């Protein structure tokens, strides 16, 4: 089973779309998984989380998605049937994860000058 590491934003109460989450818990969605419509959602690119949750009013966690998977065509948003909420990383953590994500994509051996 494919497991995808990612990041999820929440409101101040650790809710998303009215669903209450808790760090360290795993959740399962019954039914069809369709990105932007149904299933549990998260982003692979930490910076994409800011499209959905503003930095000044949100909380952020590392997550792992698995089960049925559907991907968005516009950004790194993923929908899944199983979502494990990892540790809360806060704003500094999501920014650091974003920098590391970008640096991980750089191909320094073939850098253009």
Residue ranges and their predicted role:
Residues 1-113:
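Short, glycine-biased loop/turn motifs at secondary-structure junctions and
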């Amino acid at each position: 089973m494919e497991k995808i590491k990612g990041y999820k934003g929440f409101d101040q109460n650790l809710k998303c779309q009215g669903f209450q989450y808790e760090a360290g818990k795993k959740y399962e969605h019954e039914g069809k998984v369709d990105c932007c419509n149904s299933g549990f959602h998260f982003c692979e690119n930490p910076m994409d989380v800011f499209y959905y949750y503003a930095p000044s009013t949100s909380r952020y966690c590392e997550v792992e998605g698995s089960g049925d998977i559907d991907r968005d065509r516009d950004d790194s948003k993923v929908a899944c049937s199983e979502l494990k909420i990892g540790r809360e990383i806060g704003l500094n953590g999501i920014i650091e994860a974003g920098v590391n994500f970008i640096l991980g994509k750089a191909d320094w051996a073939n850098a253009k000058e």
